[in-house]
Amino acid sequence: MAQNHVIKVSKKTLAEMTTVYQPNRLNKTVPYTVFVAKVGTTTITAYQSGKVMFQGPQAEKEAARWEGTSTTPKKKVSPQTTTLPADFGNWSVIGSDEVGNGSYFGPVTVCAAYVDKSMISKLKSLGVRDSKELTDPQIIQLSHVIKELIPYKLLIVEPKKYNEIQPNYNAVHMKVALHNQAIYLLLQELAPTKPEGILIDQFTPENNYRKYVRNEKNQVTEKLFFVTKGEQYHVAVAAASIISRAAFLEELDKESAELGFSVPSGAGSKSDQVAARILKKGGLDLLANYAKLHFANTQKAQKLL
């Protein structure tokens, strides 16, 4: 029997949900909504007011992913307001960030980077900061410099592999698994050195992250901190973001070179047109090498043929 479950979330959480459900968005317009998406049998309708309605047999389960962000039952501290120690920016820290989750073409890249306190000023002097403030050429150039200076672990999930594992994960679970693995591998490399903290650029409430980590073989659960816009709090996250972004851009360039035409980032109408071109050339088998097939862009591209 279908069920309805309604929660009310903050503007920040609504923005986060918009990103998380981007691959599952439906091509339909409903008045006063931010988006309508479908995950399995559950339809999610997010309204501009901050109300989010989950409909379907698994509605309550899907809504539970956002437990701790809802302001409906009682006032809770937003996970986005996590406070860090006053001098955290001067600690020796592992920072992690990911790129590509909302892009139809290209991989998902996740990087964990370790910045010892002795390297903080050096990286800042080189211009290591929020990657959104940098041009693509600057990001690629800085990435090469950063990788020569600090320990890091970079995971690249290319579209073909992504399409193989995606049915077994939701968007949040996949990101948790990748962040956890990148951090774990970096900790193994650093041993016996231990960071004073591990800062994850927050994409889901902390309790949700820890819930999914329990499914992983190698679980990193100590010294974890979660904040949105983590690059503003420690240069380690900025470094991880730059390395992740550069890897994503380089993989997009490889895809473009292989296909003989430019492959865009994002998930807009241009992606539909390029996908249709690839479908004409080699069908879904070829497209699976370059795009995340569960995005709505695939169906839109098929309609263009």
Swiss-Prot record:
This is Ribonuclease HIII. Keywords: Cytoplasm, Endonuclease, Hydrolase, Magnesium, Metal-binding, Nuclease. Its EC number is 3.1.26.4. GO terms for biological process: DNA replication, removal of RNA primer; mismatch repair. Residues 91-305 form the RNase H type-2 domain. GO terms for cellular component: cytoplasm; ribonuclease H2 complex. Its main location: cytoplasm. It comes from Enterococcus faecalis (strain ATCC 700802 / V583). Endonuclease that specifically degrades the RNA of RNA-DNA hybrids. NCBIfam families: rnhC. InterPro entries: RNase_HII/HIII, RNase_HII/HIII_dom, RNase_HIII, RNase_HIII_N, RNaseH-like_sf, RNaseH_sf, TBP_dom_sf. GO terms for molecular function: magnesium ion binding; RNA binding; RNA-DNA hybrid ribonuclease activity. Manganese or magnesium. Binds 1 divalent metal ion per monomer in the absence of substrate. May bind a second metal ion after substrate binding. Belongs to the RNase HII family. RnhC subfamily. It is found in: Cytoplasm. The keyword Amino-acid biosynthesis does not apply.
